[in-house]
Regions:
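Hydrophobic transmembrane alpha-helical segments in integral membrane proteins
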Residues: 1-15
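Helix-boundary and loop/linker segments of multi-pass membrane transporters
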Residues: 3-4, 32-38, 72-77, 113-114
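Central hydrophobic cores of alpha-helical transmembrane segments in multi-pass inner-membrane proteins
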Residues: 14-24, 61, 87-92
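Cytosolic/stromal cytosol-facing helical appendages immediately following the last transmembrane segment
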Residues: 119-124, 170-319
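Membrane-embedded catalytic scaffold of the fatty acid hydroxylase/desaturase
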Residues: 47-56, 76-230
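N-terminal Rossmann-like or analogous alpha/beta NTP/dinucleotide-binding catalytic cores
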Residues: 50-73
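Membrane-interface helix-loop junction between the first two transmembrane segments
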Residues: 20-40
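Loop-to-helix transition at the N-terminal end of transmembrane alpha-helices
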Residues: 10, 33-50, 79
Length: 320
């Protein structure tokens, strides 16, 4: 097995230094926002995620090598083109995973940890889940091993992907050059992803390359006309670590217990917010209501403008 390092472990000192720099900068820059308790929660979740990975990651590793034994190709570890290829392929499957994590409640129950902060800063990037293995997030990578990518190769590419995503968790950077914004994931694009504003819900799933969102219709640009609200639809309003980690699992268990038998599975695999009686709001229903209201307001403005024009015409004095 090739001995490849874990890039995220080597980056820990960099994480600590840059979070500290941004935290102190927030005292002098209004657009950079930090809360001490929120930051402590994020860092605790990040630390716990490392230990959770050590304790449970063996399941994902075993599954990876099992699938790799039945690979249909052999991607050489020593070929330069193989490393370029693995970064693109890994990022594509990351997009699939990330989209699934927002559309399948079972997977969302783990991923929600990352979105539960009402702040958006470098500390938020370290707010990672503890239950990823249990949520089966590793399943989304299995096709790569079947295609012939060595598990160590995929793990290294995944680490680089996470490292890239670290710097985009900030409000300190507005926009990158236009060409960069067109191809790469950026702070602007990822702010949209973390927003709870109806126009931004379930958008911009990219890891490194924003091209996947552009290709598959999930891209939404950031607009300066609307202030971004961060967090989740029903924010935690708590800094309790265990509640932050398990609140969605608890909610899902309650729904599973009380739901009619014919709907129980749906509470696991349908999107967050789905309910069998339509009593809750999903991202689709929230966005649909927003679009309806937006359309009503547009018609109202047009009608008001038309009435104003008619009144102005009637008020014009007649010539002698």
């Amino acid at each position: 097995m090739p001995d490849l390092p874990d890039p995220t472990l080597y980056a820990i000192p960099f994480f600590i230094i840059t979070v500290a720099i941004e935290f102190f900068a927030s005292r002098y820059r209004d657009h950079i926002r930090y809360d001490v308790k929120d930051m402590a929660t994020s860092l605790t979740l990040g630390t716990g995620s490392v230990f959770a990975g050590i304790l449970t990651g063996g399941i994902a590793v075993a599954a990876a090598f099992f699938v790799y034994e039945y690979r249909i190709f052999d991607v050489p570890l020593t070929a330069w083109w193989a490393w370029i290829l693995v970064f693109f392929v890994d990022d594509f499957f990351y997009y699939i995973f990330h989209r699934g994590a927002h559309r399948i409640r079972w997977v969302w129950a783990a991923h929600v940890n990352h979105h539960s902060s009402e702040y958006y800063n470098l500390g938020t990037a370290l707010r990672q889940p503890w239950t990823s293995t249990f949520a089966l997030t590793w399943i989304f990578s299995l096709p790569m091993f079947w295609l012939g990518f060595h598990p160590a190769m995929v793990a290294f590419a995944g680490g680089i992907n996470l490292l890239y995503q670290y710097w985009i968790h900030t409000e300190a950077i507005d926009k990158m050059p236009r060409w960069f914004e067109a191809v790469m994931n950026t702070p602007s694009h990822h702010r949209v992803h973390h927003a709870t504003n109806p126009r931004y819900l379930d958008k911009n799933y990219a890891g490194i390359f924003i091209i996947w969102d552009r290709m598959f219709g999930t891209f939404e640009p950031e607009t300066s006309k609307e202030t971004i609200q961060y967090g989740i639809i029903k924010n935690l309003k708590s800094y309790n670590i265990l509640w932050a980690v398990f609140h969605e699992w608890i909610g899902m268990a309650k729904d599973l217990w009380s739901a009619p038998w014919r709907y129980k599975l749906n509470y696991l695999i349908k999107p967050p917010g789905w309910s069998h009686d339509g009593s809750r709001d999903s991202s689709e229903s929230i966005r649909a209501k927003w679009l309806e209201e937006k359309e009503r307001n547009r018609h109202s403005e047009l009608a008001s403008g038309s009435r104003a024009a008619n009144n102005d015409g009637e008020a014009e004095p007649r010539s002698a």
